[in-house]
Amino acid sequence: MVDCAVSQFSYGKIEETRLKGRQLPVPGGYDSEGNLTTDPAKIEETWRVLPMGYWKGSGISIALDLIATVLTNANSVSKIGTFGDEVGLSQVMIAIDPCKFNSVELTDRIVDEILADIKASQPAETGGEVFYPGEIELNTRQENLANGIPVIDEVWQTILSLER
């Protein structure tokens, strides 16, 4: 399963990074002067986020937005933020069962080989680790199941204020 924003970082990840007082690991968008930045607060001022994969990512992003919007008759990404809250956005889920094409054992072996190849890649930083897409989130889920879900205090206070 691949679940990802078609921008370099999702809006949620940009907000989370800002709330944690951190910078993005690589540029994720533009500031108000048109400069690439890793500062999530400056990106939130413009919401000019980088697409994944630059020009190829732009093509994929446009194609997926067209498919999702046409199939759901919901709002295109161009409408994000125009209604205040993010409502009525188009979403499409595509599920493919690889076991309809191969045995479970073969599928698992192929996946394990590919993940091992990814994990064997040279990390960007000496002593760093290479993660496959979704691995960090999987690790976070396992930690949360074991230890509970940490909530940023500012977000928790907002949730509590909704009770009143």
Walk through the language-model features, giving the residues of each.
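Catalytic-core signal marking the mid-to-C-terminal active-site face
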Residues: 71, 76-164
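Structural beta-strand/beta-sheet cores of well-ordered domains, especially the beta-sheet scaffolds
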Residues: 26, 48, 56, 90-94, ...
